């Protein structure tokens, strides 16, 4: 190799290594969104399922409900199983729910989410 080719190779390698230092892999939590498509909390009725999105212990309606999310709540998405997403309440009414523990995390049906970012 000539001196110019060696210098060019070293320069290219240095550039690749410098860019790699800034490349951060996507991690859980890089996907966020909001609850959409559920009735407003003014129409809340836990008995009939109105005005909230059920947070469940597993990815399906057959799993136990242990929390609620409400229209406009901000969520972080951590996992996906088909149409079901594992989410964490970040802000909104879910921090002070009508039923269940504050800031719930668990599985919700994806039809009621508007999400973006690097998602599972």
Residues covered by each model-derived region:
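Boundary regions of SH3-family modules and the immediately adjacent low-complexity/disordered segments
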Residues: 29-39, 64, 88-120
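N-terminal cationic leader/targeting segments used for protein routing and processing
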Residues: 5-6, 46, 63
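N-terminal post-signal-peptidase region of extra-cytosolic proteins
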Residues: 57-65
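Residue-level recognition of short, solvent-exposed, well-ordered loop/turn junctions
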Residues: 64, 70-73
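Bacterial N-terminal signal peptides that target proteins for export
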Residues: 2-13
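SH3-family beta-barrel domains
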Residues: 25-57, 69-71, 78-81, 112-120
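Bacterial N-terminal signal peptides
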Residues: 12-21
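Short aromatic-glycine-enriched beta-strand elements
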Residues: 82-86
């Amino acid at each position: 190799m000539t001196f110019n080719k060696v210098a060019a190779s070293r320069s290219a390698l240095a550039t690749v290594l410098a860019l790699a230092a800034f490349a951060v892999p996507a991690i859980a939590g890089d996907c966020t969104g909001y609850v959409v498509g559920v009735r407003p909390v003014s129409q809340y009725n836990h008995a009939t399922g109105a005005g909230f999105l059920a947070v469940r212990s597993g990815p399906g309606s057959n799993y136990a409900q242990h929390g609620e999310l409400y229209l406009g709540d901000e969520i972080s998405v951590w996992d996906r199983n088909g149409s079901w997403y594992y989410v964490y309440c970040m802000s909104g009414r879910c921090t002070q729910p009508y039923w269940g523990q504050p800031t719930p995390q668990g599985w919700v049906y994806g039809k009621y989410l508007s999400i973006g970012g690097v998602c599972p």
